[in-house]
């Protein structure tokens, strides 16, 4: 293993936050960025493993009576770069593929909707927030990686997280 690569990261973010009424607010965030790597001197730059040029996040929160509020977050993100392999055999000695022809590709875009309901109240001079989060509400099977067979003739897509509900409490004193 030789750590001889050079990397470049550049980009920008736009954020708009707005309270539409006293009870309803939200924001929209858009990030445009690139993350490139040159693995060896003289080679062309290529997307780094976690290069995600486009990230869109939309958040909305509605305040209900008696300390309740509901909110949601939607994210749409460019898929991560991946190498699409064709033909070859896995070499156990170095963990690589022999005679593999790889081309640069990108996984499909990631999108997810998360919802949250929470209640805030005061208890003995302490601010208590109890919440229910549901991550990936519509259970989209976001592709995280491509897993290949030993000879690269077959592959499967490894999906990300399913629906995950969670309960929590935050205390401020």
PLM features per residue range, with description:
Residues 67, 75-94, 108-114, 118-173:
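C-terminal beta-signal and adjacent terminal beta-strands/loops
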Residues 1, 39-44, 95-103, 149-154:
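Extracytoplasmic loops and strand-loop junctions of Gram-negative outer membrane beta-barrel proteins
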Residues 1-81:
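Gram-negative outer-membrane beta-barrel transporters
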Residues 25, 34-39, 94-100, 133-135:
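Generic detector of short, locally flexible boundary/turn motifs and exposed helical patches
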């Amino acid at each position: 293993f030789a750590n001889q690569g050079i990397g470049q990261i550049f980009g920008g973010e736009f954020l708009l936050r707005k309270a539409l009424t006293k009870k309803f607010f939200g924001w929209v965030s858009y990030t445009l960025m690139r993350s490139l790597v040159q693995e060896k001197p003289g080679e062309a730059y290529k997307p780094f493993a976690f290069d995600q040029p486009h990230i869109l996040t939309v958040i909305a929160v509605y305040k209900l009576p008696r300390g309740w509020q509901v909110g949601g977050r939607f994210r749409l993100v460019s898929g991560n770069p991946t190498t699409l392999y064709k033909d070859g055999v896995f070499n156990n000695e170095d963990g690589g593929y022999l005679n593999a022809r790889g081309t640069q590709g990108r996984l499909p875009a990631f999108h997810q909707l998360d919802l949250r309901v929470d209640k805030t109240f005061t208890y003995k001079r302490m601010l208590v927030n109890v919440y229910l989060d549901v991550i990936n509400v519509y259970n989209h099977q976001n592709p995280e990686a491509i897993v290949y067979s030993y000879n690269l003739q077959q592959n499967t897509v490894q999906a990300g997280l399913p629906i995950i509900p969670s309960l929590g409490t935050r205390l401020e004193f």
